[in-house]
Amino acid sequence: MKAAGAPLAADFFSGAGGLSLGLEQAGFKVILSADHEPFAIRTHAHHFGGMSVDWDLSDANVVERVAELVVAAGIDLVAGGPPCQPFSKAGRSMLRYRVQAGLRDPHDERRDLWRSFLEIIERSRPRAVLMENVPDMALDREMFILRSMVEELEQIGYSVEERVVDAWRYGVPQFRQRLILVALRDNVQFRFPAETEEKVSVWTAIGDLPEVEGGWRPEGGEYGWAEYAGPVTKFQREMRAKVPAPDQHKVFDHITRPVREDDRQAFESMTHATKYTDLSKEHQRYRGDIFDDKYNRLNENDLSRTITAHIAKDGYWYIHPRQSRTLTVREAARLQTFPDNFRFDGPPSAAFRQIGNAVPPRLGFVMGKAILESLDDPRDAGISTKKTAELLAEWWLKKDREEALPWLRSCSRWLVIAGEELLDRASRTLLRQGWKLLQRNDKPWALKSAQRTRFADELAFLTENSGREQRTDRILELADRLKKNPAALDGSVGEIRAALGVAESVADLAVLAAPREPREDREAGPEEPVLITKGVLRVASRFQGNLDVERRNRMTDGRLAVARMIGIGELSRSAHLGLIELANLWCRPVTPVCSECPLTPHCNEGHRQRNMNPTLYD
């Protein structure tokens, strides 16, 4: 790409241009951006060439126009961070149907902004896509938006990689987690950039900036400055690198809000470890049980807390580590890795809001550079999420095979719950006998007195001397609860838990294995929660060759890894159940039986086992 000149990029929902700046530092030329906030648009237009437009991307006609521009301009990378609004489960059901059927969006007058972002990509087919967003976009129970995006991008020929990253591992001096999704056309593999364990501390980032009083303003208004002595650390030198020579001893935007006298006294009594409730009573103007973190002095030797748009309101979360005031605009910009020559349009509150809403330029830089490196040295991405799900579902749907968790096929929420409570990790003999007993008594809450007594006796005999005697009592307790409320089994995960007192993982599994059609009093379709229990992380870790899936961030990396194997197409539920069964039948903690696994030809661990024992796979 580089040989023909700078590759072109578009940045949608661009804000002030943090992502745009990082992409340009990486080698892209940003020629098109769109946002809907006037101050941010003017900031972007000041710093970048091309078009910085105020267009409403929820309008289908605008989306079509933007896609045409992307094609006409020959844009290589479409980037952005679309806001994601919550939407109803009925909306999810309709969208799930359209995704599974491979249908395009109807020409709705308005739409969710993430759908607009995806529609631009589907219409323009750029070589690369980069999306940055909050982790919550991906980590709801069903991971619905992320799974939908991956499915649709794969349908049009992209390979997709996604990860929740810690921005500090790429040189950003704050604790800031972000979802990064990269899609490359023609099944080219994206390789995430290497991380660092070295943290850039708050003082390393801002320690060179001069002391100022809260509320101080320089002469000259927006053209005024504070006297600046010079950078000390490598990070500070990088922030000053493009400051024009006449301004080498000036720092702009080094202003903050005035400080109330009682706040100043409170700030002076604080260290970075002080909680709001630790302050003396005369300094607590808010209820401590509600505002327990109302004030936060930054630790100069550690990362800053996440810089958010909230800093535009009062700044109490961002008290300077040494001075009794909140951060200045320039200090907040530094912690977001905006260089000192980057100015913001509007009053301080608008500048703070632009900074808090921005993608850290340094994060944009490392991701942009990694995209260019992946495109310049193209490698095949291997098996897609859709194909992986197809293999798992095909194996799951086979009738003539051994079963580790037979209740998953029962289509009965009661049998799933009872199987988990009574027979989880049971011996083969106990599993066979216990499963037959549960099948014979598939509605124990409806048994008459004599029948219930016989069922209880059979359970007691089954579990005698097995260490599972208490599980007999648990099954009978669950049956008694259902006698009072048998309809609970048709409810949501929350309703099942409330009625039966089972673990969330058990209720999730019951809902996944035995979906229900929506009831008249509820708009929801069948739920598909993404489960990381029952050994599925082990399978995902081995399959993808990523040990972090099991060892670090199970609720983020782990859930993303599982979602990457099951997709959200018409086979996703079967694929998910197949993944759970596979973990318990063949992909064991010790001595996995890779020769029986349907994923072996595409599995990192499978390749290792094949090389060690080639005769088993002939």
Q: Where would I find each of the regions flagged by the language model?
A:
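Core alpha/beta nucleotide-donor-binding catalytic domains of modification enzymes
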Residues: 2-125, 135-139, 143-146
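Conserved small-residue
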Residues: 15, 44, 78-81, 117, ...
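Class I S-adenosyl-L-methionine
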Residues: 68-72, 89-281
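Short beta-strands and strand-loop turn motifs
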Residues: 130-134, 345, 509-510
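C-terminal target-recognition/interaction regions appended to catalytic cores
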Residues: 234-382
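N-terminal polyanion-binding entry modules of DNA glycosylases/AP lyases
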Residues: 380-492, 598, 602, 616
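C-terminal accessory module of base-excision DNA glycosylases/AP lyases that mediates lesion recognition
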Residues: 381-416, 471-477, 499-509, 517-618
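Short pre-active-site segment immediately N-terminal to the catalytic Zn-binding motif
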Residues: 489-503
